[in-house]
Amino acid sequence: MKLELEKIMIEDIQFADQTKISDSTLFIDQKELFELLAEDNRITDINLDIVHPGDSVRIIPVKDVIEPRLKVEGPGGVFPGFISGEEVVGTGRTKVLKGAAVVTTGKIVGFQEGIIDMAGPGAEYSPYSKFHNLVVDCDVKEDIKQHEHEEILRMVGLKTASYLAEAAADTAADEIETYEQKPFLEAAAEYPDLPKVAYIYMLQSQGLMHDTYVYGVDAKKIIPTLMSATEVMDGAIISGNCVSACDKNTTYVHQNNPVIEELYKYHGKKYNFMGVIITNENVTLADKERSSNLTAKLAEMLSLDAAVVSEEGFGNPDADLIMNSRKLAAKGVKTVLITDEYAGRDGASQSLADADPSADAVVTAGNANEVIKLPPMEKVIGYQNFADLIAGGFEGSIQEDGSISVEIQAITGATNELGFNNLTSRSY
């Protein structure tokens, strides 16, 4: 499966009377987009805002971040199972609006959603502060329940990103990157002297709006499955998830998974990258045992020498992470685990809820319990009063001057467990 990503660099976004791309600027017909989104009669109000890096703007609570992509050649379309049909994606050509993103927000009671500050110290913790963002803020009818509310906002984000991407249809690429996932027998034979490595991609699936979708299917309902890395780039996996903001994988992160990109970087040089095994993080012990057993079985069938395993979320999924580590090790597969830590504000507590001697190579994305003070912004998009309620916030988080004291857990992407964040680790 061979996929070309044609990247079009976006250096500005503006509202205009026609949606188009010209001179690295994305122009958006606000009225046309509004009419598209308003087709869902469950939505009562829509507000569109454009924000740029360095703007004194706070977005809260953030639901999802999505990169506009358009499939121009090959089977299927971007976001299969939602925007396009169920055809297998991951081959052909896909255009990417690099530097632009869609951010969704809205008043959803009880959600563990987070903050994006476009300026100040908070901006340094969120990778999304570096994008030119179209923020879509939607209200829905009062009788809409939480699960349906999440579904409405999820579709609003995907529809908006797909609408914007259509502007790239006739725009020449500034940069082209090619990725290929060969059939397994062919891939194994290509570099017989290099260790065979795969990526174990854990997807949040705890339920209660902690969900991820694969080709439109709730990941709670899947068993571990082999995928081409190129399918992921075409939007086969999307976020429907309201887990803590710091380490949730937004749809943007799935589209731009840095673990996959890094594995391709040294493919054929240091190792033979054999592909992706997706698995879930269900809450029952039986589901955890089943998924980790089948993950280890697939690794054994591929004759893997090693695997990179990434977690999404914390607490309950720590058990899935360690089960995967232990069972892969029992099959002779070496592992490197990627996670983040909840080690207390002083960093002295146990970092994970589970542990095992097999987990002897671990990459940390940071301690989510660290506290930061975010200064007031000139403009707030959304509802700042949610700062006391979101994960990482606490009673008294909001100060009279508009500043917010929170754990970095509340900042979208601060400790992302795919490494899509700005933190680093140092030894002293």
Where are these regions (language model features)?
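Long, compositionally biased, glycine/small-hydrophobic-enriched stretches that function as flexible linkers
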Residues: 1-223, 395-428
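Membrane-embedded hairpin module used as a gating/binding unit in multi-pass transport
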Residues: 188-280
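Gly/Ser/Thr-rich loops at beta-strand to alpha-helix junctions
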Residues: 204-205, 310-319, 341-344
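A general structural motif
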Residues: 282-296
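Proline-aspartate-enriched helix->loop->beta-strand connector
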Residues: 303-304, 308
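A short helix->loop->beta-strand "cap" motif at the edges of active sites that frequently abuts
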Residues: 330-336
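Glycine-rich, charge-decorated loop segments at or immediately adjacent to ligand/cofactor-binding or catalytic sites
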Residues: 342-360
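Extended, charge-rich low-complexity interaction segments
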Residues: 362-395
